[in-house]
């Protein structure tokens, strides 16, 4: 699975760019850059911003760009400058994010905006059941995930220069409105569950507010682990990051406990205790202990419904790019088809929230 998703391939015709121009730019902007000949290979995984492994001699880097010139971009998508900014600030603050080298917003250099960061050697773990590991190894991996998301949500974002990285407060209302707009802009068919969620979610937001840096896609396969230790070296894919409610980010991360192994490699229905994987209740308790935050269990169905709505919106965006011919991965159609079942699962959790509310009345 690792080779299938994170191996490299020759750069596709649609994503080709002037390698010599890139080499010249890097010579001028990266200290100790060894210079060409520069070789470029495209990573197979990822649908949004094309990502490349670039090598100059024995030195390796990661190049991330906006999609090629033919791409039709949603208004707020592909903001690579934000990815660069948040990773740069977090890396300098001691959080496990890749070191950033240079950001170029001048599209005349290679035909699109791009940034370059370090290439981090390590493991990407795709299956959340962690096959082939012992129970203690699984427990250590999950504890490290919990530690790192708790670390992220307790970073003083203002102190590291990210006070204006998003709008503090009212996060759920703004995000529901945003993903409603983006879903409607990318719809290719009618999904009744999405219509129901778009109507219900704005009226069901739990009371209370909090603000932290939120990753937006904090899941196992967006981590690079140390080759042999249960230690996260770098958190990847910051394209959805902003200032937001940490409960939204954490509950998204907890969706694995509610998705069966056949869908997005979830862990619902597995014998977690035997496997060494914590229960959701224990995982939430560990997060709350590390952060000092409180998550009300009665609000969790809303959080799950919201995140499944949001994920369905992301999947629908991938489907739209597939239909338009601008998706940058062969996985696009498979992922796009997941929009409907994800929305339907989200509506199931919304109905649970509605039922619990009725029981309390």
Model-derived regions: residue spans:
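Catalytic-loop of the protein kinase fold
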Residues: 213-215, 220
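ATP-binding pocket architecture of kinase catalytic cores
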Residues: 37-213, 226-230
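Helical subdomain adjoining the active site within ATP-dependent kinase catalytic cores
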Residues: 293-299, 310-361
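Active-site activation/catalytic loop segments of kinase-like enzymes and analogous catalytic loops
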Residues: 248-292, 306-325
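Juxta-kinase regulatory segment immediately upstream of eukaryotic protein kinase catalytic domains
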Residues: 1-34
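Activation of the activation-loop gatekeeper triad in protein kinase-fold domains
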Residues: 236-241
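All-alpha amphipathic helical-bundle segments outside canonical DNA-binding/catalytic cores
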Residues: 166-167, 295-306
